[in-house]
Amino acid sequence: MDIIKGNLDGISKPASNSRIRPGSRSSNASLEVLSTEPASCKVDTASNLNSGKEDHSESSNTENRRTSNDDKRESCSEKIKLAEEGSDEDLDLVQRQIIPECSDEHKLEELDSQLQDAIQKMKKLDKILAKTQRREKEIKKQGLEMRIKLWEEIKSAKYSEAWQSKEEMENTKKFLSLTAASEETVGPSHENEDSFSSVFHTQIPPEEYEKQMQKLSKDFTCDVERNESLIKAGKKPFSNTEKIELRGKHNQDFIKRNIELAKESRNPVVMIEREKKRLVELLKDLDEKDSGLSSSEGDQSGWVVPVKGYALAVTQHQQLAEIDIKLQELSAASPAISSFSPRLENQNNQEPDLDGEKNMEVTPGEKVLRNTKEQRDLRIRLREIDEKLRMMKENVLQSTSRLSEEQLKCLLDECIVKQKSIIKLSSEGENEDIEDVIPMFPQLSRSIISKLLNESGTKVQKTEAEDADMLESAEREASKGYYLTKALTGHRMSEALVTEVENMKCLQFSKNDIISDTKDYFMSKTLGIGRLKRPSFLDDPLYGITVSLSSEDQHLKLNSPEKTKADEQETKDAAEECKEP
């Protein structure tokens, strides 16, 4: 085969070697003619799959399909042969036609298989529905049979002696009268009725479907026969319009019924006027039957046996009377309780009347009302007693002298104010004492203090001889009586020593030496006296203070204890004066 025109880039090499003429174009692409074997394999696999899914009953359909597939294959092979003989353009057209035909075949096969599966499922479901419907029908028939037997037994036992009590007879009569309509419906004529409960309101049972179709065909033929003359005259039939009018009437009745129901939607039980009339008729029948039974029997055994209500015993009346007497004795002065006594008398007077009325025949309703009234009166009396007791307690509490809460608060406030004033006075006195004790001395610099120390050192050396002479002369002139008087009278010697220290001004000897000398001297004098007490100068505050005459500060400390002692005495006196009032 020689290539004259066209590009064959998208085509593979040919099966047979092609001869190329020197005048023709040379192309790298080649043409390959495919055989029919792979297509047949694909079709066979698809047919095998479809045959596996289908039942044995559908084998004939598969054979027909195979024949059609074989015909298609043959047509494809013929087209390929023609393409081999023809030109390149013919090959392109043939290939374009072959590809969509094959794809359409596969799609159709898939759709057929899906439809067949769906049909099989529908058949299975139809069988299941038919079984369930048969079962329901059987159960309903059994229920109807049992109901018929029950009604027959009730009717047979209505006038028998099996009913021992009259209440059971009345109940059965009422039950039969209420369910008379349902009893009438149940009968041999209604046993064979088809009680089909449809899932959808438009569903029709399969058994009646053929009957309805026959009826429709008959109606259609009748309408056609009636309207043949009209059809010939060129007029339209009115059978459909008549049917539409009937449906419209039915719909209007339905609308009216809905309107009537909507009017009485507020009522607990929605009923139409027709239903109300029926109910009134049934109730009238029941009232007539009840009146006939009561007149025929003449007994009151059906009524409830009258029972006496709650009544106070004689002892309880006596106890209440005693309580009232005690209350009158306790609160004779109060007018509220005095008004309570006439009620007791009235009630006691009414008691025999009540007893007389009880002997009379009373219906159950009146007795219940009487009992409720008596209970109400008793509750009112108990409330009045509680109120009077509460009033008595309040009077007793008010008679006793008790301070109110406001008075107690005022007293507490006054006490707190007094305590605060005392504390303030004592604190102010202590502060004043401390301020008085603290000396207001001028602060000296270190240079001045050093000068004073140097001057004191020179003066001490000059006065040592004079002091020694003065002490010796004092010891010689002193006598025993003089020192004893000094020891007994007080701390005169201490004052003398203070004056001597002030006069000496910065002597360089320690106070410990002075204290040791004076202590030894006075103790030696006092040991000789048996009954004398400890001298008062030993308790002097100056006796325990260390004196260092090397600095002026220590010299100034000697004057401060005397002032503190005086201040302490003044504070003590002030505190005693505050306590006395």
UniProtKB/Swiss-Prot annotation:
PTM-bearing positions, type Phosphoserine: S87
One Pfam family matching this protein: FSIP1
Coiled-coil residues: 103-153
Matching InterPro entries: Fsip1
Sequence ranges of Basic and acidic residues compositional bias: 52-77
Keywords, alphabetical: Coiled coil, Phosphoprotein
Region ranges (Disordered): 1-77, 338-370, 553-581
Amino acid composition bias (Polar residues), ranges on this chain: 14-30
Family: Belongs to the FSIP1 family.
Name this protein carries in UniProt: Fibrous sheath-interacting protein 1
Native source species: Macaca fascicularis (Crab-eating macaque)
